[in-house]
Structure formats: C-alpha cells, structure tokens
Amino acid sequence: MMLHIPGVLTKAQVAQCREMLDTADWVDGNATSGAQSALAKRNRQLPEGSPVARTVGDAIQDALARHPLFFSAALPLKVFPPLFNRYEGGETFGTHVDNAIRLLRGTDFRVRSDLSATLFLEEPDAYDGGELCVEDTYGVHRAKLPAGDLVLYPASSLHHVTPVTRGERVASFFWIQSMVRDDGDRTLLFQLDTQIQALSAEKGAKDPVVISLTGIYHNLLRKWADA
C-alpha cells in the first residue's frame, strides 16, 4: 500500500526546518547507501551525526507521533531517525530496493525496514523532475507532494527518484519497523480502522456495531502484532 499522508508538518514548521537545513553542511549521498544503492545514487545528504539532522529529525518524529493517520497506517514500533537529502542539476536516484535492516551508526539500534517514508520539504512547483516512483504489481506510482506532506510505502518496493532538471528537491526520508510485519495484514487493519472511524463519526462510539468492529480490530492486532 502506498499512502499520501498530508500535513505532517505545517508550512511554518517546514520554513523553520528549511532555515536550519539550508545552512548545514551536506555530503555525498552515498554515505548511507548499501552496495546496490551506491551504484544508482547521485544526490547530497546530511551526515547522520549532524546536529541539524538531529534537531530537525526530532521535530519530524514529534509531528509523526501526533498524526493519527500515520499511526493508523504504519502501526510503528520503531522509527529510524530521519535523514535528509537534496537533488539539483540532474541529480537522481536509480531503481533500487532499501536495505532490510538499518543500523544507526555508532549504536546498537536496529530497525527492520517494513515501511519507507519520504517527507517533502520543497513545494512541487519549485523544481522539475524529482518524482518518487514506486513499483508494485499494479504498475508504477508517482509522488511529488506539497511541502509538509509524506508518502508511505512498503520498503520492499523497487523505487527511484527521477532527475531534478530545474530547482532543488529537498526531503527527509526514513524507515519504520511496524508492530505488524506483513504488509497485507497491516493494510487490512488500516482499512478496518478507517471504516470504524467513519462509522463512529456517523453513529457514535457507543453504537453496538462500532463496539463490535473495534473489538475485532484489536483482536486481529493482538494476533498479528509484535510489541
């Protein structure tokens, strides 16, 4: 499932993040690449230990924790600290798949990458190209979202970023280990939760059907979750 999650950051928060990011020191993007990704990757990135990356990353994680749609879709157990990249002048990232396990450098903190996320930090009309293209059995899905919006997709997906031919694309990217490992199970829970919320808004939280469906949701989560 590929999902657009709007408004993770407000426009004011995006501006604050960009003010810090634009004055930071960027390095070659292959600093975090696996062997396959390094062959395809041409961009720049903030080092993982950068104070700016930590400060802006903490703000993003705080925003994610307050966003009910993100929680419902991802059911996060662990979130890898957000990283940051930028593309301009034809820079691109060819087709690749993300590493299954991400290790935070200098620590023993590991994340199984069930989900990948990209949070856009530049408005789409400010640059040409730079589309995130995610492949699945139904074809190729493209994302180029407003600043502050996030796209969430299975980390097992082949994906690429098209060349940026005008302007600059700035984004944060990170991985999530979900409480529910299987993408199909997680998608089913998300669909069920979405319908429960809609029915609750219409009938009220004390409606017998709402209560019954909520019980089914939690029993399925209990069956499938690692916590």
Swiss-Prot record:
A molecular-function term among this protein's GO annotations: 2-oxoglutarate-dependent dioxygenase activity
EC number(s) reported in the record: 1.14.11.-
Keyword Iron: yes
Residues the record lists as binding 2-oxoglutarate: 169
Cofactors, names only: Fe(2+); L-ascorbate
One GO process term, biological-process aspect: intracellular iron ion homeostasis
Binding-site residues for Fe cation, renumbered to this chain: 96, 98, 159
PROSITE patterns found in the cross-reference section: FE2OG_OXY
InterPro entries: Oxoglu/Fe-dep_dioxygenase_dom, PKHD_C, PKHD_hydroxylase, Pro_4_hyd_alph, Pro_4_hyd_alph_FE2OG_OXY
UniProt keywords, alphabetically: Dioxygenase, Iron, Metal-binding, Oxidoreductase, Vitamin C
Pfam families: 2OG-FeII_Oxy_3, PKHD_C
Entry's cofactor comment: Binds 1 Fe(2+) ion per subunit.
Record has Metal-binding as a keyword: yes
Domain Fe2OG dioxygenase: 78-178
PANTHER family in the record: PKHD-TYPE HYDROXYLASE YBIX
Identification of the protein by name: PKHD-type hydroxylase Bcen2424_4810
